[in-house]
Amino acid sequence: MPSTYLSLCNQVLRRLNEVEIIEGDFASVLGVQALVKDAVKASVAKINQAEFEWPFNAAEETDTLVVGQEEYTWPSFYKIADFNSFQIQEDTALGVSFTTLKYIERDEWYKKHRDNDYASGADGISVPRYIFPSHGNGYGVSPSPDKAYTLKFRYYQNYSDITAASDVTRIPDSYDTVLVDGALYHLYMFKDNLEASQASFMAFERGIKDLQTLYINNYEYIRDTRVKY
């Protein structure tokens, strides 16, 4: 269970031997307490930016396709999608079974499919078979859907701002110490304490590497890529 914004701030304040924040005063604090709030935000943002595919940022989206519409926007806080996961859901009423979409480049859609999709107008063509990155902030399907099919896919979320005392970070609470080290680094930088900030930065970087080792650098098999001559 991730820790709340208030809990993280108070952990940092205890490390500094400063007065903790009362929840009712959280929105209006000043001085060092306000600096700690900013430092915790910066620490959370840095961890989220360190990797595209943190497992704790994994999410799943369900969209209902619109007849005759090929392109759609990403959900809020979207970072990166798993294009292998896009699947039309089975629906006996629509006469469709589970269908995994094949990824194509946007240029391929432009060259081979867009004209037919656009020519179909508001009627669409059939069950989509392809998925592609749209121009801008979204994705596209082809052929143009002729019914309101349900599409599911998996993606990773970006950093979402924390503002209220009860907001949570999505980062597991077992790594609160990493967040605290990051907050101390930013706090000491605010205060121009270079020696203390450097020590906290090193601890913060080690903590991020530990997170990467645990969650990212985890291979189930190794493939030999040597070429035989």
PLM segments and residue spans:
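Glycine-enriched, solvent-exposed interface loops adjoining structured elements
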Residues: M1-Y229
